[in-house]
Structure formats: structure tokens, C-alpha cells
Amino acid sequence: ARDGGTTLAIWDDPNSNGPADPTGADDENPTQILIQSAPLFDIDKISTYLDGDPNVLLAGETLRYTITVQNIGTDNAAGVEIVDQIPANTAYVAGSTTLNGVAVPDAADGRSPLVDGIPINAPGDPTPGVMNAAATDNLATIVFDVMVYPDVPDGTVISNQAFVSAVDYGIADIPSDDPRTAVPDD
């Protein structure tokens, strides 16, 4: 529950020695266990080469990032945002950002809207920033493109990371992970 959980009290037979008394010091004190519920996010990010050889990225080519965010926790979340800085040695492709297939306007200066962060939601609930748990359609999909600078030297590594937060729940900067590698949070 959003209130921090539910307390479950466990005690012995109330017919023996009387009813449970959590304030007393006798053998009828219940053992209390706090049941916690909270949102928990699974954030995957993959890249796809859009030009030429799908296995080789060259200078001047376009790279597409696809990020999926799912609340796999036991509680709904509100105020969920994603932030993603454009990787070094690339330029954002104007107008390429979508959330669940719907265009997201660029920042006023033409930058990616993800640089400053945007509220996200899954198609199951169109409320901005809401990610429900246990919904059948609770997977948000964010897509954007970048172009590798034409003068980038051969061997340059293009690296990028997205971060998801739900500040109302004390969740900040959970990094994305590329599920195609064994390295966590890469």
C-alpha cells in the first residue's frame, strides 16, 4: 500500500492465557510483521542500426534506441519519469521521440525531450506519470533516434543510459539495462 505497508499481527491461541495485548510484556504479545508493497521497475534499452549493415555502425549513420519500462512491483506508481541524455559523438534526430507510438514534442530549442525528462505511462492507463502494477498493458515504450557524427573516428564507442524515477515513492535514477548483454545496468 502507498501508506508504507500493512502490519500483520501473529499471536498464539487467545483461549490460552487471554487475548493478545501488543502493549503488554506478557506472553500474549503478537509478533508483528510489516508487509511492504512498492513499485519496482524493469527498464530495458536496446539499440538498432538503421542504415547499412545491421551489425556494424559507421560514422554518419542513424542509431535507434528503444526503451521499455514496466512496473513489476506490487503497487501502482505515479510521478514516473524517464531521463536520457543524448550520447557523446551523436546528434539527436529532431522529431524522432515517441511514447507508446505517439510523437513527443521536442524541447523548444530542438533538443530531445528526454534530456530534461518526460512523464511516462503505459497504454493501459494514459495518465502521464502513472505506471500501474499488475495491469495487462503496463509496458511503456520510448523510442528516439540519433545520428553518429560523420567525423567520428573508427573504433569510437557510443554509449547511452536511460534513468527512471518515481520520486513520490523514493525511487530515483534506476538505470536501464541492455538485455542482450550479461552486464547489469549497462
Regions found by a protein language model. Name each.
Residues 1-186:
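Exported/extracytosolic protein signature
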